[in-house]
Amino acid sequence: MKIELAREEDREEILALYRMQIGREFCPWTEQYPGNDEITFDLSRDALFIMRDEGRIVAAISLEEDPQVDALECWTKDLQPGGELARVAVHPDYQNRGLARQMVQYGLDKLKERGYRSFHAVVNRLNEKAIRSYAVFHFNLVGECEMYDQPFYCYEKELN
């Protein structure tokens, strides 16, 4: 399987992958989010990466820019700028194979390449699967917050 930068011609397949996540446990995604606006934004910044298996898109991840998350007080000042990863999606037929971990590691490497000193993320406190995945990477729990009418943990990791 190969990870590569997404292209405009991948849009419909990525959107279909996003839609497959709706209704999954702990997934707050809807028919509106993520959608074409997020894909357009990510493509415009070369920030959307996909994993293919025999030509089929089986996973995706985005490098995110979110001023609301960046403005949280919990982030370590000496580790700025911090980058985010978002919209991690794995095709249901490929779940529980470690693909999300591979995508996150790839995203962390890309953030470092682009000059970010740290990774930071907000994760829904009820999303046990994501929390377990993040433990593998030894992300530090640095705070809690409420955003988008949901409770979140704030995680951070120095990129070195």
What are these regions (language model features)?
Residues 2-16:
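A short beta-loop-alpha structural element at the N-terminal edge
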Residues 15, 19-41:
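Conserved GNAT-fold acetyl-CoA-binding loop/helix
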Residues 90, 96-109, 132-136:
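Conserved acetyl-CoA-binding loop-helix of GNAT-fold acetyltransferases
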